[in-house]
């Protein structure tokens, strides 16, 4: 029978910070991680924008409160991508921001990144959760989102929701399609594709945890 717990200690924690109270039941771990997951993810696009300008914008965004970055730029030679990822991790960690590296566990480990982001093909081939603090995946279908949940990943990127220059022939699934694809799923989901910073409330109204942007962050 439940009863009031008088005189128990209460501690107010800042949203986005990890809880320090222990012990905590394991079932609460995904909830606490979701609370610590920022609502806006910036995805790097230095291949198109240029390294210098991209890093300048990143510093500005981090100073303005950005706290989650995905290093993409998969077309670069390994050495160039390693250097860029190291620079992003350094800048982000100076501001207390998280960094995940797209598709390359070796670079993620060597740079001290916080996690790994799996492209959809890597998600399909994955048999167990990679050994990183933060692991997410790109998903395009409800089945892929479900698979990410089965692997106990921390988040999924779902899209494209709206038309985007990255996929000019794809009109996007729209907000209705996004809501349908993510319905009933407990995994934190970011809306991807054609996003702007002022769309966060719209995304959350359709069931998203947040938004992911390659442009406009």
Residue ranges and their predicted role:
Residues 58-64, 90, 94, 109, ...:
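Acidic (Asp/Glu)-rich catalytic clusters
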Residues 43-47, 74, 104, 121, ...:
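Active-site beta-loop-alpha junctions enriched in small/polar residues
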Residues 99-114, 140-154, 183-191, 195-213:
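Catalytic cores of alpha/beta
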Residues 4-47:
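Nudix hydrolase/Nudix homology domain
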Residues 119-128, 157-169, 197-217:
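Glycine-rich phosphate-binding active-site loops on the catalytic face of alpha/beta enzymes
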Residues 37-55, 134-139, 191:
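Active-site mouth loops of central-metabolism enzymes
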Residues 81-103, 120-123, 128-141, 169-197:
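Alpha-helix-loop-beta-strand connector modules within alpha/beta enzyme cores
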Residues 70-80, 160-167:
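Glycine-rich, proline-tolerant flexible connector loops at the mouths of alpha/beta enzymes
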């Amino acid at each position: 029978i439940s009863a009031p717990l008088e005189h128990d200690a209460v501690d107010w924690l800042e949203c986005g910070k990890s809880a320090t109270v222990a012990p905590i039941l394991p079932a609460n771990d995904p909830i606490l991680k979701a609370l610590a997951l920022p609502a806006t993810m910036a995805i790097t696009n230095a291949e198109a924008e240029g390294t210098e300008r991209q890093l300048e914008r990143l510093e500005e965004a981090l100073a303005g409160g950005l706290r989650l970055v995905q290093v993409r730029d998969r077309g670069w030679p390994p050495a160039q991508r390693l250097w860029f990822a190291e620079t992003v991790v350094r800048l982000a960690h100076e501001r207390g921001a998280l960094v995940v590296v797209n598709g390359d566990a070796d670079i993620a480990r060597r740079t001290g990144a916080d996690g790994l982001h799996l492209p959809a093909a890597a998600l399909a081939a994955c048999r167990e959760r990679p050994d990183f603090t933060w692991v997410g995946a790109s998903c395009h279908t409800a089945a892929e989102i479900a698979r990410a949940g089965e692997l106990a990943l921390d988040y999924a990127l779902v899209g494209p929701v709206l038309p985007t220059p990255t996929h000019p022939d794809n009109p996007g699934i729209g907000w209705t399609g996004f809501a349908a694809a993510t319905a009933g799923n407990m995994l934190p989901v970011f809306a991807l594709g054609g996003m702007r910073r002022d769309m966060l409330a719209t995304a959350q109204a359709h069931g998203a945890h947040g938004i992911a942007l390659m442009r406009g962050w």
